[in-house]
């Protein structure tokens, strides 16, 4: 009874801490292009979201659920970020309870301690994108796969299928991760428990059938990626090393990759020696997902970046939690625990710092300076990204950019540069790269001044207001 009370106190204490943390991170106002895209998508109807998303490179479930969640709040940025935090909170609450039941309270509590602080997932904890939802889908798929293996109950199969579909409809590399989980469960059934083959086949068929409505869009998106230039850079040995370092420490302290890497190898040896199948199979999911992404990128076309592995983060932390909970030596256990918690907590400072407004960040005050402009002309190198951020702060003034999203655009006021016609305009706001004057070839007879230099997510830009003089 005393142990149960201690577990309950720790469980709810961690949940309170995590809830406060996610609510705090959701206060961030530092928006980047992909988040602006999400916010522009929400006012559209569900049918329009399906159509627009089909022309993009992601499935639609995140936008549907985000629209429903934020509807009472007027599609606010805070509500959208909070939706991501809620998904992470569910992972934490369900994971802590179920992992404690299945693998012992020590494993469950370590999962709860480490997952909110894991920098790779923490960096996306309140991001207005689909990574939190896809993480939830992959985690549910894996959790119910294990429950199916133990108990073979119908509702566990339903949970397994629901998790797989949530992953598949949220992000394509979450789909890959779910496919790996389905495949690993099949292999285990063939080797050790053939009575599970029939329900596996039935619920796999159900999964495929329920994915059929999106399958045509998925195939068309794959064909587009295969036949057109895409923004993802080729993977090299150097970039792969950088990606792995980023996975280990995100944007935090440099010592973290060494600490976490060495501990990970130690846990791998320990769990392999004890033949602990569940955490080893859990680790196989991100490893195989990463390997497939790198292989396709190397052989066909670059399609993978390291943040696409975020949906597998709960499984990585489950592996770590299993490893540390099996350390027998009290001295070694204490040292390992201190290293992990210190390293993770140190990175927490960087995540919290990110919610602070960027110095000279482009925001509504910047667009207010140019409120007399009849149009924005984007002449920055990253015109596709900058135009989306500008549209978030001013969704009424026409914005013209060299690169646009075409049919995949949810923005009401972004147009291709070919449609720019300044003949009837008296004032135009021009955005250029920092320290770069406007190109006046498209604005004959215009002169003006620079209003300021701003940080628009990853780009430093100059904002100019030009007025017709002739």
Give the residues covered by each predicted segment.
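Short, Lys/Arg-rich, polar N-terminal cytosolic tail immediately upstream
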Residues: 1-5
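Terminal, non-globular segments
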Residues: 7-468
């Amino acid at each position: 009874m005393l142990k149960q009370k201690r577990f309950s106190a720790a469980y709810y204490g961690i949940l309170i801490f995590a809830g406060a943390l996610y609510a705090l991170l959701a206060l961030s106002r530092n928006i980047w292009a992909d988040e602006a895209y999400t916010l522009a998508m929400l006012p559209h109807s569900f049918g329009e979201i399906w159509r627009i998303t089909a022309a993009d490179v992601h499935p639609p479930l995140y936008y549907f659920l985000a629209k429903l969640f934020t509807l009472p709040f007027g599609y606010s940025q805070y509500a959208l970020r909070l939706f991501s935090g809620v998904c992470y909170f569910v992972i934490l609450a369900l994971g802590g309870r179920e992992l404690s039941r299945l693998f012992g309270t020590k494993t469950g509590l370590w999962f709860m301690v480490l997952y909110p602080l894991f920098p790779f997932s923490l960096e996306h904890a309140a991001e207005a994108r689909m990574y939190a939802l896809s993480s939830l889908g992959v985690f549910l798929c894996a959790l119910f796969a294990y429950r199916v293996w133990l108990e073979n109950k119908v509702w566990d199969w339903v949970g397994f299928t629901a998790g797989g579909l949530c992953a598949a409809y949220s992000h394509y590399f979450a789909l890959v991760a779910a496919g790996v989980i389905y495949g690993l469960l099949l292999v285990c059934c063939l080797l050790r428990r053939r009575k599970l083959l029939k329900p596996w086949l039935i619920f796999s068929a159900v999964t495929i059938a329920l994915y059929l409505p999106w399958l045509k869009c998925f195939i068309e998106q794959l064909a587009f990626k295969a036949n057109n230039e895409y923004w993802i850079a080729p993977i090299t040995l150097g970039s792969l090393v950088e990606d792995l370092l980023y996975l280990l420490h995100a944007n935090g302290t440099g010592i973290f990759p060494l600490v976490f890497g060495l501990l990970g190898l130690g846990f791998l040896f320990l769990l392999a020696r004890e033949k602990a199948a569940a955490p080893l199979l859990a680790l196989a999911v991100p490893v195989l997902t990463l390997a497939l992404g790198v292989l396709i990128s190397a052989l066909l076309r670059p399609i993978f970046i390291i943040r696409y592995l975020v949906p597998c983060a709960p499984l990585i932390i489950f592996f770590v939690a299993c490893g540390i909970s099996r350390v027998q030596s009290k001295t070694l256990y204490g040292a390992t625990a201190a290293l992990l918690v210190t390293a993770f907590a140190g990175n927490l400072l960087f995540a919290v710092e990110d919610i602070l407004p960027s110095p000279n960040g482009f925001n509504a005050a910047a667009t207010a300076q140019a409120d007399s402009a009849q149009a924005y002309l984007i002449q920055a190198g990253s015109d596709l990204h900058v135009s989306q951020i500008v549209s978030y702060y001013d969704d009424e003034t026409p914005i013209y950019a060299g690169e646009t999203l075409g049919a995949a655009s949810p923005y009401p006021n972004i147009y291709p540069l070919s449609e720019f016609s300044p003949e009837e305009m008296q004032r135009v706001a021009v955005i250029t790269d920092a320290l770069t004057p406007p190109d006046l070839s498209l604005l004959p007879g215009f002169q003006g001044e620079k209003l300021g230099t701003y940080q628009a997510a990853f780009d430093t830009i100059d904002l100019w207001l030009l007025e017709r003089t002739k």
